[in-house]
């Protein structure tokens, strides 16, 4: 879950892992739909506030971009989504190039281009001033502290030109917001709808994307529950279970039979609706009913979180899982990783026979076999 088995260089899905057995599925969110939403959210904000955003009045709306992991499908999709929406993307083999631009104050980088945006009869230049992968010295990606340091470096060098901050996630986004953007009234856009980011919208955070973590967490455990009960995988998902739990396909999620993957659908969270998203750990009303323990008896699940320090996974996703595991009569052992090595996690799966089911959150999307090899 959360990190889809795939080739980190090409994005090609690891079909061997996804077809490990008849009860193997992936649960995540629709990365492309969410990426497009984030990009459009930024464009809409600029159009509505262009005269205020262009802080130095030079006619150039400059943005900086925090990239989470250059080899991660979701990070790639979000970088492409922002560049596509803003018009700054360069074609690379039929896709928008997601390569970090480094520093691009002069607009001469090879992986992005300047774009134009017409607002109320005035034409603005849109420029990606800088972008980099937020990877720390220990190798951990999506690193919030690194993002905070980056905005410090960028703002010291060309701060007056930074009009918008965009991030592949809220952890990095909030780090940059708190370090510089908030005090300088620069709108910052993230992804995940973490509770602190949603609350910060009242203080100038531009917006974020809810990837329906409540639906994702439910699906993560529900597909396991269905397999353990020997019922159709759609039970309690697209088809109501005996308790009345049921999601709406096309509104809450979509399913790809070819990819054996469930994808939660996303929604933009802005100043217009953020108050509806202030509790990120509340279970989804549609799937909040307790299962009958006589029909779905207690089972033991091993579940890892690839990085125990990841803001979204630790403050939103795991609390949701913990709320759902009781409803689904599952006893879950939660294993927190260091965000750097698979062995830090797999070394704690010494006796798989103790468990009835497994939910795997890899450090790197290439490494599904590090786990499946232990389960054969």
Q: Where do the PLM segments sit?
A:
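Hydrophobic alpha-helical segments within soluble ligand-binding/sensing domains
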Residues: 25-58, 77, 144-151, 193-197, ...
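Hydrophobic alpha-helical
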Residues: 82, 108, 113, 118-199, ...
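Structural recognition of the beta-strand scaffold that forms the well-ordered cores
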Residues: 1-2, 25-28, 62-66, 163-168, ...
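Exported/periplasmic ABC-transporter solute-binding proteins
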Residues: 160-167, 178-250, 263, 271
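Extracytoplasmic "Venus flytrap"
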Residues: 67-76, 164-170, 300-327, 331-352, ...
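Flexible loop/hinge segments that line or gate small-molecule binding clefts
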Residues: 1-33, 54-62, 194-203, 369-376
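Short, solvent-exposed amphipathic alpha-helices that sit
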Residues: 34-38, 73-129, 146, 150, ...
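Hinge/cleft segment of the Venus flytrap/periplasmic-binding protein
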Residues: 59-62, 66-70, 74, 86, ...
